[in-house]
């Protein structure tokens, strides 16, 4: 199954609450923090919502 490496590259300060909440629910707390998540439609939707704040890489496992 594919995995996604998600890195927070821009601060969510100054953005709407729902975007801040999405970043938090992805597990990203501080700038340049990274999480690895399964490549599922729910996570893709969350990434799409905050695509201007994160960097995404696909990794094989």
From Swiss-Prot:
Gene3D superfamilies registered for this protein in UniProt: Ribosomal protein L30, ferredoxin-like fold domain
GO molecular function terms attached to this record: structural constituent of ribosome
CDD domains: Ribosomal_L30 (cd01658)
Record's GO cellular component terms: cytosolic large ribosomal subunit
Listed Pfam families: Ribosomal_L30
GO BP of this protein: translation
Disulfide bridge partners, by residue number: none
Record key words, sorted: Ribonucleoprotein, Ribosomal protein
InterPro entries hit by this protein: Ribo_uL30_ferredoxin-like_sf, Ribosomal_uL30_bac-type, Ribosomal_uL30_CS, Ribosomal_uL30_ferredoxin-like
Subunit structure: Part of the 50S ribosomal subunit.
Protein family according to the UniProt entry: Belongs to the universal ribosomal protein uL30 family.
Protein name in the entry: Large ribosomal subunit protein uL30
Gene: rpmD
